[in-house]
Amino acid sequence: MSINKIFEESWKNRLTKYEIARIISARALQLAMGASPLIDTNNLPFNDVISIAEEELKRGVLPITVRRVYPNGKIELVSVKKVEFK
């Protein structure tokens, strides 16, 4: 089994820490620029844009897709809605 295949299988439904940081920062920027939150923010302990973006990501409500390009040229699209969080 090739190393690319092992990587694809182990990260299929997970995000790297870099992908998570990029998604949260992009969504926090959208919220800071006036976008409406996709969740009810009244029950959150903190009401800043980063906390809201993190919670939206954890709940799986963000309509974002991550595009991964592998060294062999294969492209994989990972929907944030289908990602598992521990």
UniProtKB/Swiss-Prot annotation:
Gene name of the encoded protein: rpo6
Species lineage: Archaea, Thermoproteota, Thermoprotei, Sulfolobales, Sulfolobaceae
GO biological process per UniProt: transcription by RNA polymerase I; transcription by RNA polymerase II; tRNA transcription by RNA polymerase III
Swiss-Prot/TrEMBL catalytic activity: RNA(n) + a ribonucleoside 5'-triphosphate = RNA(n+1) + diphosphate
E.C. numbers: 2.7.7.6
Cell compartment(s), UniProt: Cytoplasm
Protein name as it appears in the record: DNA-directed RNA polymerase subunit Rpo6
Pfam families on file: RNA_pol_Rpb6
GO molecular function annotation: DNA binding; DNA-directed RNA polymerase activity
